[in-house]
Swiss-Prot record:
Taxonomic classification: Archaea, Methanobacteriati, Methanobacteriota, Methanomada group, Methanobacteria
Catalytic activity: aldehydo-D-ribose 5-phosphate + D-glyceraldehyde 3-phosphate + L-glutamine = pyridoxal 5'-phosphate + L-glutamate + phosphate + 3 H2O + H(+)
EC identifiers of the protein: 4.3.3.6
Pathways involved: Cofactor biosynthesis; pyridoxal 5'-phosphate biosynthesis
Keyword Oxidoreductase in record: no
Cross-referenced Gene3D superfamilies: Aldolase class I
Disulfide partners: none
The protein's name in its UniProt record: Pyridoxal 5'-phosphate synthase subunit PdxS
Organism: Methanosphaera stadtmanae (strain ATCC 43021 / DSM 3091 / JCM 11832 / MCB-3)
Keywords: Lyase, Pyridoxal phosphate, Schiff base
Positions annotated to bind D-ribose 5-phosphate: D23, G152, G213, G234, S235
EC top class named in words: lyase
Record text on subunit structure and interactions: In the presence of PdxT, forms a dodecamer of heterodimers.
Amino acid sequence: MIHGTKVLKEGFAKMTKGGVIMDVVNAEQAAIAEDAGAVSVMALERVPSDIRKAGGVARMADPSKVIEIMDAVDIPVMAKVRIGHFVEAQVLQSLGVDMIDESEVLTQADEDFHIDKEQFTIPFVCGARDLGEALRRVDEGAAMIRTKGEAGTGNVVEAVRHMRTIQGAIREIENKTEEELWQVAREINAPRELVKLTAEKGRIPVVNFSAGGIATPADAALMMQLGADGVFVGSGIFKSENPELVAKAVVEATAHYEDADLIADVSTDLGAAMPGIDINEIPEEERLQNRGNLI
């Protein structure tokens, strides 16, 4: 197998910085996302809110669905695989997608291992709730991290929690000695070289987007102000009353996240946002964010 270089994979991820990646389930939605200014689309059969409602086992999208969406747009297309399901990843690579999301939104396939992402030519994005989780995924070859949030809820609280957790951990290690960093590496179960690099850079070594519960332009701007390099929006666009308007507004708010006047303007008369779920109504064992966090 010919391996894509680490530089090329991370370079692709950096090209999406400052942008919005939108979940789409068909060619029509993909075209709406592209017209709104999305930097990429995520091809899947059901958005996270529908996956949550349906229950059962959620798997990689049918290849015909992925191809339909790839043929509909000129922007990069991503697709999800189950955690640890390297054959689903092989299939998506064969189809020619631009990036693979090893995602907790789908049912976990392997409770002991994530995919060895260095065995693939295309880049991967993975979710994380804390610094240790993020750096373990980077060590496996992830070219992008996204804070997990709680997908399919329309509730940004967990996305905020995870971004603050990661950013806070980075601030704590920035001025530590090398010996102290080794201790941190042991405590968070992460490679010490990556812990040291994170302390030196003042950020995790790859692009870090936010995901899970972003439903409004203000949500997107909030995550950017908290330190995200960009945002994933799953159910928030196409479960809203006016997807075309919301998609454009989220893109504008993400690009101009410090301009309150602009955010107010694009947030006006959008219609109803997607229905939300109080995180306290979701039992701990049913929270998607918990999938893969112990690996």
